[in-house]
C-alpha cells in the first residue's frame, strides 16, 4: 500500500522571534535556537530529499556572470547518487539567506524577513525529470524566510562582497499555478516506512501540494502563502510597532513577541522540566536544560575530543586551544574570548549593578551573584556532605569542604612548595612572596594584600559592627570575632594539643601553647635582641624603644603604651567600671576578662617544679620545663640518631639531611633552611643594621656580630690555645686557629680542589669561579665579592678613617694599612728573603720582591701585552687604556687613576710633610723625594751609565745623561 503525504511547511515546526526579542537572547540561547532550526530544517528536507533538490549552476547572462539557482525533481532511484550533494546545496542556500539578511540589517535595521528571488527552470543533470520548478525554500513555506536571518547570528562577521544579491527577473519563467508532485517509490526501507507511519507530521495523502502564493503586497509586490504572513509583512511598510509593553514601553510588531517579552517582568516560567521540576520562561531554554538529564553531548572538540551539550559551549571551549581573545575593553585594553565576558567586565568600569535583591535591595553586577545571595534569605542549602552531613548553599563550597576529609591540596606554590586546598588560598599566599597589596583604603591610604582585610579595616573608620550575639547582644565588626565569642557561651574547645591533649577555644591560643613544648621564641627585637614567644609581647616591648603610645584618652588626650593603662586612667574621668587583679594589680574593663585572667594565677599555683621552684600554668608546661633538669631528649633523628628536647628543633635538624630550603630571597633567589637565616640575609640587600653597640655606636646586621664586637671593648678573651697560648674572644675563632697547628683544611673547592681551613673562606673563594659579586655600592654601583671589600670601598666615599696610630695620631681606612704603618715606628722587618737576605715589614712586600729573583710576571695586559708581577699593578695599568680616574679630590675636584696619587695630592691642601730626614730634619711630602734627598748625606749614587761608567744619585739624571750617547734630544 502506497503512503500518501500531506501538506507540511517549515512554519509548522518553526519558532519565531522578533528582532527585539532576538536581542534579549544570550549567546547560548541563540546557538540553541540555530541548532533547533537547522535540525527541523534537515528533518523536513530528509523526508523529501530525493524528490526536491536545489542545484546551483553558473551561467553568463546579459548582465554578466550571475549565480542562478535551479530547482528540479529527481527520481527516487537516483537518491544514492545525489543525496549528500543536495543536502550540502540546501545548507549553502541557508548561508545565502544569512548573508543577504546581514546586509539588509546593516542598511535598514528593519524587519528580519528578506526576499531573494530565485531563477527556477529545468536542467538535465543526471537526466532527471522535473515535476515543478519552485525553489525548495518556497516549498518549505514563507515562515522559513523569516527565520533564516536569525540563523545568521552565529556566523562570523565579515565583509560581504556583494551588498545585495541582484534579483533576476524570472516572471516569464515561473507560473503561479505550477505544482510539485512527488510519488515515492515502494522500495523504501521498512524502518524508514515505520517512521513515516509514526510521524505526526505526515497525513494520509500521496501527494504534496504546495500552496500558491496568492497573497501579494501592494507596496513591494512580494507574494505570500498565508494572509497572516502578509499582514506581518505589511507592518514593515507601515513602520508601525503596534504592541507596546505597559511596564517598560518597549514596542513589538507581533503580539506573540510582546507575550514572550512580558515574562521578563512577570517572572512567569510556563515551561517545566518533568525530571527535576525546574521551570523556564522559554521553550528553547527547557530543551537545552533537558540535555543535562539525558547526558546528551553531540558537540565534540576536534582538538581534544571533549564533548558538550551545547554548540555555544564548544565555541567557547575552542578559544582555549586557539588562545583567541577578540573582544577588547576600550577602557583598560583587556581582552576576552567571549563577548559576554566583556559585557560583565565593563560593569567594573561603569559600576552597573542591574540585578537587585527584592528582600534587601542589595544590587549585584552578575545574576549568579544575586542567585547565591538569595540563598541567604531563603536559607536554602541543597548541597550535602556525605561524610559529616553538613550542608552548603553552593556546590563549590561543598567541593572545598570535602578536601577537609580527603586532605587533598591540589594547589602548589612554585616558590616555596607549600600546598593549598583552595585556589584562592594559593593566590593570597603568593602575595607573601611578591609583597603585593592591591587593596587600598581611601580614608588613610593603608594597603592590604586581601580584600577581606580592607573591608574589615574600613569598619574602623565607619564604626560598623554588623554581627550580633543572640545570647548577650554584643556586636562585632567581624564574623570571625562573633564565632570566637560564641564559644564563651557554648564552652566549645575545638583546638587540641597533640603533645598533652589540652584543648583550647581559639587556634591562636593553641599556637601559643605549642611554644611551651618547643621552647621556641620566634619574635625578636631588632633594637636589643630580646626574644619573645608571642608577637603581641614583642609589639608591646618595641614601644619602649619607639616611644609609641597608641592608646589615647578621648577626654584629655593623654596617651598610653598599653590598653590596661588607658582603662585605669579613664577611671579618673569616671568612664567605665574597673576590675583590678589583686595578684598583679592589672586592671580590666569587664568582669569576663578578669575572670579569664584569674585563671592564670590559679593555674600558676597548680604546677611547681621541685628542682628550681618555678611555677607553671599547665602540667604540660612543667613537663617540658623538666627536660632542662633531666636532660631528656625524646625527639630522635632517624638519619643520624641525634636527639632533641623539642620537636621543632628536630624538624629544623631534618632539613640538613633533606636539603630542604623553603625560605627564598625575592631579591637574589637564594634559599635558606630557616626563616631567621632569610631575615638576616635580607639585611644585606636593605642595608639594615638593627644591632647597635652602646660603647662606640657601631651597628651590625646580626646580634652575633654585635656580641663579637663587644669583646673589643671589654678585652675579654676566654678561649685560649693550649699550643701557643693565644687567647680568643670566640670559641669559633679558637677552633679555626687550632687548624693552623694541625694543618687541617676540611673545606674543599669542587672546581679547583683547593682546600681551606674555614667554610667562609671557601664560600668567598667560590665567587672567583662563579663571578658572583653580591655586595653592591649604593653610591657608584660598584660590586664586590666580599662584604669586607664593600665596607672598605665605602670609606672612599665617606672619607672615614677609623683606624688610628697611637704613636703619631695618623688615621687609616683599613686595619691592614695601620699594621703596615706601625712597622715604620717599630722598625720591625720580620719577613726575610732567602735569596738575598733583604727584610720586609710585610709578607705581601716579600712576595712581590721574590718575583724579582724568579722573574715571574703572571699578569698580562690584554691591550698592549705588557706583563706585571702584581695584579694590582695590572689593574692600575689598565686605567691608562680606559682613561678611568676613580679617585677624586674633595677639595678641588681633581681626579687620579691611583689612590696613592690622590693621597700625595691631598698633602698639597693640608701642607702635610710626613717624611723627615733624620740627618738634617728636613721634611717632604713624598717618600721618593726623601730617598733622593738622603743620597746627599750618604753620597750614594746607585744609578750607573753602562756606556761610560758615570754614576748618578737619581734615575732621572741617568736618563738625561743617556741622551748624550744616543743623540736624542727628548
From Swiss-Prot:
Main location: nucleus
GO terms assigned for molecular function: DNA binding; zinc ion binding
Zn finger residue spans: C2H2-type: 215-237, 243-265, 271-293, 299-321, 327-349, 355-377, 383-405, 411-433, 439-461, 467-489, 495-517, 523-545, 551-573, 579-601, 607-629, 635-657, 663-685, 691-713, 719-741, 747-769, 775-797, 803-825, 831-853, 859-881, 887-909, 915-937, 943-965
GO (cellular component) term, any one: nucleus
Highest taxon of source: Eukaryota
Pfam families found in the cross-reference section: KRAB, zf-C2H2, zf-H2C2_2
Domain KRAB span(s) in chain numbering: 8-81
Keyword vocabulary terms for this entry: DNA-binding, Isopeptide bond, Metal-binding, Nucleus, Repeat, Transcription, Transcription regulation, Ubl conjugation, Zinc, Zinc-finger
InterPro entries: KRAB, KRAB_dom_sf, Znf_C2H2_sf, Znf_C2H2_type
Crosslink (Glycyl lysine isopeptide (Lys-Gly) (interchain with G-Cter in SUMO2)) position: 205
GO terms, biological process: regulation of transcription by RNA polymerase II
Role summary: May be involved in transcriptional regulation.
Name by which UniProt lists this protein: Zinc finger protein 845
Gene transcribed to yield this protein: ZNF845
Amino acid at each position: 500500500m502506497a503512503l500518501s503525504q500531506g501538506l507540511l511547511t517549515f512554519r509548522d515546526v518553526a519558532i519565531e522571534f522578533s528582532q527585539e526579542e532576538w536581542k534579549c537572547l544570550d549567546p547560548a540561547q541563540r546557538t540553541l535556537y540555530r541548532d533547533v532550526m537547522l535540525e527541523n530544517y534537515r528533518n523536513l528536507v530528509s523526508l523529501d530529499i530525493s524528490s526536491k533538490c536545489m542545484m546551483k549552476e553558473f551561467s553568463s547572462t546579459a548582465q554578466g556572470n550571475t549565480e542562478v539557482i535551479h530547482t528540479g525533481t529527481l527520481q527516487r532511484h537516483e537518491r544514492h547518487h545525489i543525496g549528500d550533494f543536495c543536502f550540502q546545496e540546501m545548507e549553502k542556500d541557508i548561508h545565502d539567506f544569512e548573508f543577504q539578511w546581514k546586509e539588509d540589517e546593516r542598511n535598514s535595521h528593519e524587519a528580519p524577513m528578506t526576499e531573494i528571488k530565485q531563477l527556477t527552470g529545468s536542467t538535465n543533470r543526471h537526466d532527471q525529470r522535473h515535476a515543478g520548478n519552485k525553489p525548495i525554500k518556497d516549498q518549505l513555506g514563507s515562515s522559513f524566510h523569516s527565520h533564516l536571518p536569525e540563523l545568521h547570528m552565529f556566523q562570523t562577521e565579515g565583509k560581504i562582497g556583494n551588498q545585495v544579491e541582484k534579483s533576476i527577473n524570472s516572471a516569464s519563467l515561473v507560473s503561479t499555478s505550477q505544482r510539485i508532485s512527488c510519488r515515492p517509490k515502494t522500495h523504501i526501507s521498512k524502518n524508514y516506512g515505520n517512521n513515516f507511519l509514526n510521524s505526526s507530521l505526515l497525513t494520509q495523502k500521496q501527494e504534496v501540494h504546495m500552496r500558491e502564493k496568492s497573497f501579494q503586497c501592494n507596496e513591494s509586490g512580494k507574494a505570500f502563502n498565508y494572509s497572516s504572513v502578509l499582514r506581518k509583512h505589511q507592518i514593515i511598510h507601515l513602520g508601525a510597532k503596534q504592541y507596546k509593553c505597559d511596564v517598560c514601553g518597549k514596542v513589538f510588531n507581533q503580539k506573540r513577541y510582546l507575550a514572550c517579552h512580558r515574562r521578563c517582568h512577570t517572572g512567569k516560567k510556563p515551561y517545566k522540566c518533568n525530571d527535576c521540576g525546574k521551570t523556564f520562561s522559554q521553550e528553547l531554554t527547557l530543551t537545552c536544560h533537558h540535555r543535562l538529564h539525558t547526558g546528551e553531548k553531540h558537540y565534540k572538540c576536534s582538538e581534544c575530543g571533549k564533548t558538550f551539550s551545547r554548540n555555544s559551549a564548544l565555541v567557547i571551549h575552542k578559544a582555549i586551544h586557539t588562545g583567541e581573545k577578540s573582544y577588547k575593553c576600550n577602557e583598560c585594553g583587556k581582552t576576552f574570548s567571549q563577548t559576554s565576558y566583556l559585557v560583565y567586565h565593563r560593569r567594573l568600569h561603569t559600576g552597573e549593578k542591574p540585578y537587585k535583591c527584592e528582600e534587601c535591595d542589595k544590587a549585584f553586577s552578575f545574576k549568579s551573584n544575586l542567585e547565591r545571595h538569595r540563598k541567604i534569605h531563603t536559607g536554602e542549602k541543597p548541597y550535602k556532605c556525605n561524610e559529616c552531613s553538613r550542608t552548603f548553599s553552593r556546590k563549590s563550597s561543598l567541593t572545598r569542604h570535602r578536601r577537609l576529609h580527603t586532605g587533598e591540596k591540589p594547589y602548589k606554590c612554585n616558590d616555596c612548595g607549600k600546598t593549598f586546598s583552595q585556589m584562592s588560598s594559593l593566590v593570597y599566599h603568593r602575595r607573601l612572596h611578591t609583597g603585593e597589596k592591591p587593596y587600598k583604603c581611601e580614608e588613610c591610604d593603608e594597603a592590604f594584600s586581601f580584600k577581606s582585610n580592607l573591608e574589615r579595616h574600613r569598619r574602623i573608620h565607619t564604626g560598623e559592627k554588623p554581627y550580633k550575639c543572640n545570647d548577650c547582644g554584643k556586636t562585632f565588626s567581624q564574623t570571625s570575632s562573633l564565632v570566637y565569642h560564641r564559644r564563651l557561651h557554648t564552652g566549645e574547645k575545638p583546638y587540641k594539643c597533640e603533645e598533652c591533649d589540652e584543648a583550647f577555644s581559639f587556634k591562636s591560643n593553641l599556637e601559643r601553647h605549642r611554644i611551651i613544648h618547643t621552647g621556641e621564641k620566634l619574635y625578636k627585637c631588632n633594637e636589643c635582641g630580646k626574644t619573645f614567644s608571642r608577637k603581641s609581647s614583642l609589639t608591646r616591648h618595641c614601644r619602649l624603644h619607639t616611644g609609641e603610645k597608641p592608646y589615647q584618652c578621648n577626654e584629655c588626650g593623654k596617651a598610653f603604651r598599653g590598653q590596661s593603662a588607658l582603662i585605669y586612667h579613664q577611671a579618673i574621668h569616671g568612664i567605665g567600671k574597673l576590675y583590678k587583679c589583686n595578684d598583679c594589680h592589672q586592671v580590666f574593663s569587664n568582669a569576663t576578662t578578669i575572670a579569664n585572667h584569674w585563671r592564670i594565677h590559679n593555674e600558676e599555683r597548680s604546677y611547681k617544679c621541685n628542682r628550681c621552684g618555678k611555677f607553671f600554668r599547665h602540667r604540660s608546661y612543667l613537663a617540658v620545663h623538666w627536660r632542662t633538669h633531666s636532660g631528656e631528649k625524646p625527639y630522635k633523628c632517624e638519619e643520624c640518631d641525634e636527639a632533641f628536647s623539642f620537636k621543632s628543633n628536630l624538624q629544623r635538624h631534618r632539613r640538613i639531611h633533606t636539603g630542604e630550603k623553603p625560605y627564598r630571597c625575592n631579591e637574589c633567589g637564594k634559599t635558606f633552611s630557616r626563616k631567621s637565616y632569610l631575615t638576616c640575609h635580607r639585611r644585606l640587600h636593605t642595608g639594615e643594621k638593627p644591632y647597635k653597640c652602646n660603647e662606640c655606636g657601631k651597628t651590625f646586621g646580626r646580634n652575633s656580630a654585635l656580641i663579637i664586637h663587644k669583646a673589643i671593648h671589654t678585652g675579654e678573651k676566654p678561649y685560649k690555645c693550649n699550643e701557643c697560648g693565644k687567647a680568643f674572644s670566640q670559641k669559633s675563632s679558637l677552633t679555626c686557629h687550632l687548624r693552623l697547628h694541625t694543618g687541617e683544611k676540611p673545606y674543599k673547592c669542587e672546581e679547583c680542589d683547593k682546600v681551606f681551613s674555614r667554610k667562609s673562606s671557601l664560600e668567598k673563594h667560590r665567587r672567583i669561579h662563579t663571578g658572583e659579586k653580591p655586595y653592591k655600592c649604593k653610591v657608584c654601583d660598584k660590586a664586590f665579592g666580599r662584604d669586607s671589600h664593600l665596607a672598605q670601598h665605602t670609606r672612599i666615599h665617606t672619607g672615614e678613617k677609623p683606624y688610628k696610630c697611637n704613636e703619631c695620631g695618623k688615621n687609616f681606612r683599613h686595619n691592614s694599612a695601620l699594621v703596615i704603618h706601625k712597622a715604620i715606628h717599630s722598625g720591625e722587618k720580620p719577613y726575610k728573603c732567602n735569596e738575598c737576605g733583604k727584610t720586609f715589614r710585610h709578607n705581601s712586600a716579600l712576595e712581590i720582591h721574590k718575583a724579582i729573583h724568579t722573574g715571574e710576571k703572571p699578569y698580562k695586559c690584554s691591550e698592549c701585552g705588557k706583563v706585571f708581577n702584581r695584579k694590582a699593578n695590572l689593574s692600575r695599568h689598565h686605567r691608562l687604556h680606559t682613561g678611568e680616574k676613580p679617585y677624586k679630590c674633595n677639595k678641588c675636584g681633581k681626579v687620579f687613576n691611583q689612590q696613592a696619587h690622590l693621597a700625595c695630592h691631598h698633602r698639597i691642601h693640608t701642607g702635610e710633610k710626613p717624611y723627615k730626614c733624620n740627618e738634617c730634619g728636613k721634611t717632604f711630602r713624598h717618600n721618593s723625594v726623601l730617598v733622593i734627598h738622603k743620597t746627599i748625606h750618604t753620597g750614594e749614587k746607585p744609578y750607573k751609565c753602562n756606556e761610560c761608567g758615570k754614576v748618578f744619585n737619581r734615575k732621572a739624571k741617568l736618563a738625561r745623561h743617556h741622551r748624550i750617547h744616543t743623540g736624542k734630544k727628548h
